[in-house]
Amino acid sequence: MIGSALVWALNNRGIDNILIVDRLGDDEKWKNLVPLQYADYMDADEFLDATKVAGDALGQVGAIFHMGACSSTTETDCNYLMRNNFAYTRDLAQWASSRHYRFVYASSAATYGDGSDGMNDGSENLYA
């Protein structure tokens, strides 16, 4: 949902040469893409594999907005969180940095909660 909101905002600025990278899975997230304008879609794991094999063949990159971390505060699979949130982000950031691409990483509300206690950087779960 957050990623599609970003694409919508970019579309409203006349930007549509966007490669959407995601794991759509079996739910109905794909419906968020229907009204949007973008150049292509690629599975997240296939994209990361492509950066390792043919990183420069992916085309011209203006910026990477990485919003792919699992922000669920109820996720308990530590292996999944480390693979998805840490390793994937690290590998993507290293690839972007090696090519001098702008890399924007989105944090989440999981870091700060609902704000009722102000900002607290204390970690209550593996994601935060």
Regions found by a protein language model. Name each.
Residues I15, S98-Y101:
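A short helix->loop->beta-strand "cap" motif at the edges of active sites that frequently abuts
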Residues A93:
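Conserved SAM-binding loop
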Residues A44-D45, A50-N84, G113:
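NAD(P)H-binding glycine-rich loop region in Rossmannoid oxidoreductase-like domains
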Residues G25, S71-S72, Y88, A110:
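Alpha/beta-hydrolase active-site loop signature
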Residues M1-A63:
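N-terminal Rossmann/SDR dinucleotide-binding element
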Residues R83, A87-R90, S98, T111-A128:
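Catalytic helix-loop patch of NAD(P)-dependent Rossmann-fold dehydrogenases
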Residues M1, A109-T111:
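Catalytic nucleophile-elbow at a beta strand-turn-alpha helix junction centered on a G-D-S/GDSL motif
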Residues V21, I64-G68, F103-A109:
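SDR active-site strand-loop-helix element
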